[in-house]
From Swiss-Prot:
Binding site for substrate: N103, D202, E462, E538, Y539, A540, H541, N605, W1000
InterPro entries referenced in this protein's UniProt entry, alphabetically: B-gal_small/dom_5 (IPR004199), Bact_Beta-galactosidase (IPR050347), Beta-gal/glucu_dom_sf (IPR036156), Gal_mutarotase_sf_dom (IPR011013), Galactose-bd-like_sf (IPR008979), GH-type_carb-bd (IPR014718), Glyco_hydro_2 (IPR006101), Glyco_hydro_2_AS (IPR023232)
Domain of life: Bacteria
Keyword Electron transport: no
Organism listed in the record: Escherichia coli (strain UTI89 / UPEC)
MF GO annotations: beta-galactosidase activity; carbohydrate binding; magnesium ion binding
Residues that bind Mg(2+) 1: E417, H419, E462
GO cellular component: beta-galactosidase complex
Keywords on record: Glycosidase, Hydrolase, Magnesium, Metal-binding, Sodium
The protein's name: Beta-galactosidase
Enzyme Commission no: 3.2.1.23
Family: Belongs to the glycosyl hydrolase 2 family.
Pfam families xref list: Bgal_small_N (PF02929), Glyco_hydro_2 (PF00703), Glyco_hydro_2_C (PF02836), Glyco_hydro_2_N (PF02837), LacZ_4 (PF16353)
Length: 1024
């Protein structure tokens, strides 16, 4: 044990937090989570242990701008002005200091290992009583599961130890410091340490005791470590559970270890042995270790699909059977290996349906509770995710247990990122930083190695490639050869990774960056001598309105076996709740706390909002990742299961044929499909519809029974096919009414019954409509070629740094947002049964014509206005965001009804999950409340739209809401939006894709750009 004086002054003088060679003082060795049961039955059933006591709750807290400002007296007693805070928590969420959001740039001046003298310091204290029996015998430990960034610990005024690495436990022996009665803990937490240089992850930078604190009482002679490994014969019919147990304390001949394996109430196997390890070398073996091997016939294998778990109980006892203590863990029998270029689980090649997940809560910062963790897992499972990457640090210990039990594959990642270093490997190639890096990797492995859900270790994130990585890769492969290791840094295919694991590599497009080219994922597979599997550690950057082009990745994954999926970036928006002057909550992002530097809204890349409400993009991910695929041939549906281990024992296939959303026929068939099997379903002869319209066949896989992660009736997969269109024609009834045209010096006015249309002859726009005496328009109907920029349109542009290649900057530079209409033509003609208005506009900026729009409006005796639009795009202007029409309707109706793709928001390159049907939603649901306002709410493939008294027909896309594109463009946060008068309607003949391969470079695929030069579309606008 390291002994230093208890004096605060001496601790401050040592400055351990600026010494990369000091990562801990007196911290105990890492190990799996312990509970030290004194009853093996309680260990088997995982009941709360009487030897494990939580210290979570209210602690006294005082904040100081620097550690030197902390008074020495604090070690002995609480300060008179100390506050009370809840532990675990981040002190920034209690109003102390400010959270800082930055992606790459370090929040402190880069001068490793030194940190600013103004180093915010939180002083925590807690008084507690200790059970006298704990003082009489054994060892009492204190466990801090997570403290950011570094801390010193005192107990009863005496210095205990020091720890850093904010994402792994720091555990200390308190036995020598405790006494009967009241005891006092004092914890000095520093915001910045040399460890901060290894924790440059894309997240909020927060501080404090943010994970659980507990006391653990162990016997003097104790189990100090145990690890379990499962091994198999070739066909997985026989397995061996290998348990290596290590003890600490007096090594006596009478000591025995028993390992028993349980499946529920049934004991499957058991073995007992004295200590004394196998021979290691010419000097012998470990006297304090023993390895037991239990044979298991026909084990029920663990997978994310069927997370079968056993329970291993490890007992330390004397020869006469007296139990000293027991530890336990869940065991999943599974094998992970790479063979012939494929990542295999239990002999089957995996397809990773993964997502990156930060630990984030909108109210509690980086504090995770069980309810939130379970909510995340349920949502992931419900949306067809089978894997999660712990980006970019080891998670709360409970997370892994939940993943074991619910079934998720886990990439466990070391808390190492040096993204802001120049070059990135400045520290990771420096031997002085090897001890700090080593602790972060080795302690992660030692804590989490017993979890079957952990199938891959990761050496960290975005830290270049250094010699330290190579050393740690070799250490893991030596200590735990049962799992592959991945690491993206230095080009994603270095010697420190078993898996090619690039981030944001595109399907077909190479990105030849200097030193570390990023090949297309298809090309990577074909590089000479390359036989590793490729799994994208990050792809499909889901920032705001994004995930366009997701389907092309999944087409490639299914086409090329060695493309084994990837992890979407990322799961949850990292917005935080703030309150305005009236106490109303709003969602904040980088810079909203006065934090500098900051990367604004780049913290919001989630498939779900911070409160776990899904983004529309989540449905696209669910659909592309679904485990059932469908093919239609005639009246036969072929259903293929992509499950590797599950039989479809809880699925029905529901099918329906509908004409323009009206059901014509339907049925339900139980699915009986084995793993990777097929089933053919023959549909009956379908009735012939009597009217014209689009005929669609929809199939849905429905789970009739609830599961551990879903309710009864859950839809897990679906597909639609458009059948041959019914071409029967219903002729319109003859009309004897003829619209009347009146011409004045300023307007053309057309009147038919109680309806009137007014076209302004100076502007050439439809300026007003009336139904009776009620005006229908607040603004004229006019062309629209722009959208409120998406995050993907903005890229890395900001006020102080313009990226001229970003779509929004190209549109601005070309004048798309500033373009004004110059009238070229506005004429009116009376036809035999209609009035025809013809207009032409040149949309110009600074004398240059960008678009020419020609329209005809034909108003007939039924009151239908047929609008034909022809648009020519200048050859030297950027491809526009949209080609359509916009106006502000006077009405505000509660409901929106449409026949088209829905129900969720969809865009041309993100619509495979949308279904063609007749949908009816509240107006409020037509708007997607992205925290950073942007273009949103589009519905594609629309044939008919009904709103208030109006109906539009054609083949178009639309969005409709209380917010104009202008307001969305000019507003920084959604809570600042105000509902405008009336309703804004945007009807597009064509709309550009949204992209999403990444959010910092143009990523809309060419086929989803509006590059044709000439466009035509038609609408019918009438009143019901």
């Amino acid at each position: 044990m390291t002994m230093i004086t208890d004096s605060l002054a001496v601790v401050l003088q040592r400055r351990d937090w600026e010494n990369p060679g000091v990562t801990q003082l007196n911290r105990l060795a890492a190990h799996p989570p312990f509970a030290s049961w004194r009853n093996s039955e309680e260990a088997r059933t995982d009941r709360p242990s009487q030897q494990l006591r939580s210290l979570n709750g209210e602690w006294r807290f005082a904040w100081f701008p620097a550690p030197e400002a902390v008074p020495e007296s604090w070690l002995e007693c609480d300060l008179p002005d100390a506050d009370t805070v809840v532990v675990p928590s981040n002190w920034q969420m209690h109003g102390y200091d400010a959270p800082i959001y930055t992606n790459v740039t370090y929040p402190i001046t880069v001068n490793p290992p030194f940190v600013p003298a103004e180093n915010p310091t939180g002083c925590y204290s807690l008084t507690f009583n200790i059970d006298e029996s704990w003082l009489q015998e054994g060892q009492t430990r204190i466990i801090f599961d997570g403290v950011n960034s570094a801390f010193h610990l005192w107990c009863n005024g005496r210095w205990v130890g020091y720890g850093q690495d904010s994402r792994l436990p720091s555990e200390f022996d308190l036995s020598a410091f405790l006494h009967a009665g009241e005891n006092r803990l004092a914890v000095m937490v520093l915001r910045w340490s040399d460890g901060s240089y290894l924790e440059d992850q894309d997240m909020w930078r927060m501080s404090g005791i943010f994970r659980d604190v507990s006391l653990l009482h162990k016997p003097t002679t104790q189990i100090s470590d145990f690890q379990v490994t499962t091994r198999f014969n070739d066909d997985f019919s026989r397995a061996v559970l290998e348990a290596e147990v290590q003890m600490y304390g007096e090594l006596r001949d009478e000591l025995r270890v028993t390992v028993s394996l349980w499946q529920g109430e049934t004991q499957v196997a058991s073995g007992t042995a004295p200590f004394g390890g196998e021979i290691i070398d010419e000097r012998g073996g470990y006297a304090d270790r023993v390895t037991l091997r239990l044979n298991v016939e026909n084990p029920e294998l663990w997978s994310a699909e069927i997370p079968n778990l056993y329970r291993a109980v490890v007992e330390l006892h004397t020869a006469d059977g007296t139990l000293i203590e027991a530890e336990a863990c869940d065991v999943g029998f599974r094998e992970v290996r790479i063979e012939n270029g494929l990542l295999l689980l239990n002999g089957k090649p995996l397809l990773i349906r993964g997502v990156n997940r930060h630990e984030h809560h909108p109210l509690h910062g980086q504090v995770m509770d069980e309810q939130t963790m379970v909510q995340d897992i349920l949502l992931m499972k419900q949306n067809n995710f089978n894997a999660v990457r712990c980006s970019h640090y080891p998670n709360h210990p409970l997370w892994y247990t939940l993943c074991d039990r619910y079934g998720l594959y886990v990439v466990d990642e070391a808390n190492i990122e040096t993204h802001g270093m120049v070059p990135m490997n400045r520290l990771t190639d420096d031997p002085r930083w090897l001890p700090a890096m080593s602790e972060r990797v080795t302690r992660m492995v030692q804590r989490d190695r017993n979890h079957p859900s952990v199938i891959i270790w990761s050496l960290g994130n975005e830290s270049g490639h250094g010699a330290n990585h190579d050393a740690l890769y070799r250490w893991i492969k030596s200590v735990d050869p049962s799992r592959p290791v991945q690491y993206e840094g230095g080009g994603a295919d270095t010697t420190a990774t078993d898996i090619i694991c690039p981030m944001y590599a595109r399907v077909d497009e190479d990105q030849p960056f200097p030193a570390v080219p990023k090949w297309s994922i298809k090309k990577w597979l074909s590089l000479p001598g390359e036989m590793r599997p490729l799994i994208l550690c990050e792809y499909a950057h889901a920032m705001g309105n994004s995930l366009g082009g997701f389907a092309k990745y999944w087409q490639a994954f299914r086409q090329y076996p060695r493309l084994q999926g990837g992890f979407v970036w990322d799961w949850v928006d990292q917005s935080l709740i703030k309150y305005d002057e009236n106490g109303n909550p709003w969602s904040a992002y980088g810079g909203d706390f006065g934090d500098t530097p900051n990367d604004r809204q780049f913290c919001m890349n989630g498939l779900v909002f911070a409160d776990r409400t899904p983004h529309p993009a989540l449905t696209e991910a669910k659909h592309q990742q679904q485990f059932f695929q469908f093919r239609l041939s005639g009246r036969t549906i072929e259903v293929t299961s992509e499950y590797l281990f599950r039989h479809s024992d809880n699925e029905f296939l529901h099918w329906m044929v509908a004409l323009d959303g009206k059901p014509l026929a339907s049925g339900e068939v139980p699915l009986d499909v084995g793993p990777q099997g097929k089933q053919l379903i023959e549909l009956p002869e379908l009735p012939q519809p009597e009217s014209a319209g689009q005929l669609w066949l929809t199939v849905r896989v429905v789970q009739p029974n609830a599961t551990a992660w879903s309710e009864a009736g859950h839809i897990s997969a679906w597909q639609q096919w458009r059948l041959a269109e019914n071409l029967s024609v219903t002729l319109p009834s003859a009309s004897h009414a003829i619209p009347q045209l009146t011409t004045s010096g300023t307007d053309f006015c057309i009147e038919l019954g109680n309806k009137r249309w007014q076209f302004n002859r100076q502007s050439g726009f439809l300026s007003q409509m009336w139904i009776g005496d009620e005006k229908q328009l607040l603004t004229p109907l006019r062309d629209q070629f722009t959208r409120a920029p998406l995050d993907n349109d903005i890229g890395v542009s900001e006020a102080t740094r313009i990226d001229p290649n970003a779509w929004v900057e190209r549109w601005k530079a070309a004048g798309h947002y500033q373009a004004e209409a110059a009238l070229l033509q506005c004429t009116a003609d009376t036809l035999a049964d209609a009035v025809l208005i013809t207009t032409a506009h040149a949309w110009q900026h600074q004398g240059k014509t960008l678009f020419i729009s020609r329209k005809t409006y034909r108003i007939d005796g039924h009151g239908e206005m047929v609008i034909n639009v022809d648009v020519a795009v200048a050859s030297d202007t950027p491809h526009p965001a949209r080609i359509g029409l916009t106006c502000q309707l006077a009405q505000v109706s509660e409901r929106v009804n449409w026949l088209g793709l829905g129900p969720q928001e969809n865009y041309p390159d993100r619509l495979t999950a949308a279904c063609f049907d007749r949908w009816d939603l509240p107006l409020s649901d037509m708007y997607t409340p992205y925290v950073f306002p942007s273009e949103n709410g589009l519905r594609c493939g629309t044939r008919e739209l009904n709103y208030g008294p109006h109906q539009w027909r054609g083949d178009f896309q639309f969005n409709i809401s209380r917010y104009s594109q202008q307001q969305l463009m000019e507003t920084s946060h959604r809570h600042l939006l105000h509902a405008e008068e009336g309703t804004w309607l945007n009807i597009d003949g064509f709309h550009m894709g949204i992209g999403g391969d990444d959010s910092w470079s143009p990523s809309v695929s060419a086929e989803f750009q509006l590059s044709a030069g000439r466009y035509h579309y038609q609408l019918v606008w009438c009143q019901k």
